[in-house]
A protein has these predicted regions:
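Metal-dependent nuclease catalytic cores that hydrolyze phosphodiester bonds in DNA/RNA
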Residues: 2-161
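Mg2+/Mn2+-dependent nuclease catalytic core
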Residues: 128-228
Length: 228
C-alpha cells in the first residue's frame, strides 16, 4: 500500500473539505435556538427538556429562552450514561437481525432493534435540529421545531410497527442489608410523569416524520443492586 503524493488532487480535496465546513457553518448560523429572536424566521428549536421546563415553571422558561438566565444544572450520573452505552452496544450487535435475551425473557422475542441509516442522528441530542435526518419536526402553526435525542427504536416483527425505547437507571433496593428487598419498577411515581410526556412527544415526532409508530413505548430499567 502506497501513500499518494501531494498533488493538485490533494489541493482540490482540501478545498472541497473547507467548502463543506463553510457550508455547514452557514447552515448552523441559520438555526434558531438558544435565546428566542422574534426577527428570526427560522423555526425555533425546542427540545423535550425545554418543553418540560415550560410545563414545570413558565416563568423559568421565559427567563431562559428570552433572557438566557439558566437554572442551576444537576450533573449527569456516570452510571446512567454507562448504562445507555452498554444497552445500545448490545442492541447494535443484533440490530436488524434478531432480538435480545432480555426481551425474549419478557415475552417480547418478536421485538428486534431497528436498523435505519439515520438512527445515529436520531440519538444525537445536541444537534437534533440540524436537518431533517435528525429527530425533529416543525410545527407549522407555531414555527417551532420540536425534537431531541432518542435512546433506541425497536421493530415489532408481528405488526411491522416501530416502538420508541427509553433506557433508565435506578436503585430500587431497600436500604437495610439484613432484610434486602427490591421494589418493582413502576411509572406511577409522581416525578415520573415527565418520562411519560417524553415518550408521548417522541412518538408524536416520529409519526410526523412519516413512520408507522405504535402508541406503546418501552422503558428498559437497569436496577443497581447494592445488597452486599
Amino acid at each position: 500500500m502506497a501513500l499518494e503524493p501531494s498533488s493538485k488532487r490533494g489541493v482540490y480535496e482540501g478545498k472541497r473539505y473547507t467548502d463543506e465546513l463553510k457550508n455547514e457553518g452557514q447552515k448552523l448560523s441559520k438555526r434558531h435556538r438558544g435565546r428566542f429572536d422574534p426577527m428570526n424566521e427560522a423555526p425555533y428549536e425546542l427540545s423535550r427538556g425545554r418543553v418540560e421546563n415550560y410545563l414545570k415553571c413558565k416563568a423559568c422558561f421565559w427567563l431562559e429562552q428570552i433572557h438566557k438566565v439558566k437554572p442551576p444544572e444537576i450533573p449527569s450520573f456516570t452510571l446512567n450514561t454507562t448504562t445507555d452505552i452498554l444497552l445500545k452496544r448490545d442492541a447494535d450487535a443484533v440490530r436488524g437481525r434478531s432480538t435480545l435475551p432480555l426481551w425474549e425473557k419478557a415475552g417480547l422475542g418478536h421485538m428486534i432493534p431497528w436498523q435505519h441509516d439515520h438512527l445515529e442522528n436520531w440519538a444525537n441530542s445536541l444537534h437534533y435540529g440540524l436537518n431533517d435526518t435528525y429527530f425533529n419536526t416543525v410545527h407549522d402553526e407555531t414555527n417551532i421545531k420540536f425534537g431531541g435525542g432518542i435512546d433506541d427504536v425497536f421493530l415489532n416483527t408481528k405488526t411491522n410497527q416501530l416502538h420508541i425505547v427509553d433506557y433508565k437507571s435506578q436503585a430500587q433496593g431497600t436500604r437495610s442489608p439484613i432484610k434486602y428487598e427490591v421494589k418493582p419498577s413502576s411509572l406511577n411515581d409522581p416525578w415520573k410523569i415527565g418520562y411519560k410526556r417524553q415518550m408521548d412527544m417522541y412518538i408524536w415526532v416520529a409519526r410526523r416524520k412519516g413512520f408507522n409508530v405504535s402508541g406503546t413505548g418501552y422503558f428498559v430499567y437497569v436496577d443497581a443492586q447494592h445488597k452486599n
